[in-house]
């Protein structure tokens, strides 16, 4: 899979690239290079004049670092939208629920999405699953996503890397084609 294999109008969908995910309350995160890989994808998409959309989370939880009235709602500097790139704000894990994302994509006849951002096992996964269920062809660059350590119902701890790899395995070949960002960032 290379950038040349994608349709010219493949949409880069950047999920929750927000400063609030730098809050230590989230715990340990995997993939410290995720922001750089997202920046590479953004640069490639913009240079090729391909469509880019941004989805961000506005949490209703009073203590969330992702509330719209807090500093954590801001974009990470590596992934700030530029003029003309639509922004969709969601209140749940899916970028499609409560937003106009699906309508925007359908009005422009986009059928292929490349999904990146945070977090692999929550909002990236949910948006990817819904996109496929809605009939979109989805590519997921593994190194342009990341997640955090999690605790199971019984107190067992799972590392961020375990969660990341497991989430990608669940999505691969059923909801998305999992690739590496370098394949998609290559010059067309």
UniProtKB/Swiss-Prot annotation:
It comes from the Archaea. SUPFAM superfamilies: Isochorismatase-like hydrolases. The keyword Nucleotidyltransferase does not apply. It holds the Pfam family Isochorismatase. The lineage of its organism: Archaea, Methanobacteriati, Methanobacteriota, Stenosarchaea group, Halobacteria. It comes from Haloferax volcanii (strain ATCC 29605 / DSM 3757 / JCM 8879 / NBRC 14742 / NCIMB 2012 / VKM B-1768 / DS2) (Halobacterium volcanii). Its EC number is 3.-.-.-. One of its GO terms (molecular function) is hydrolase activity. This is Uncharacterized isochorismatase family protein HVO_2328.
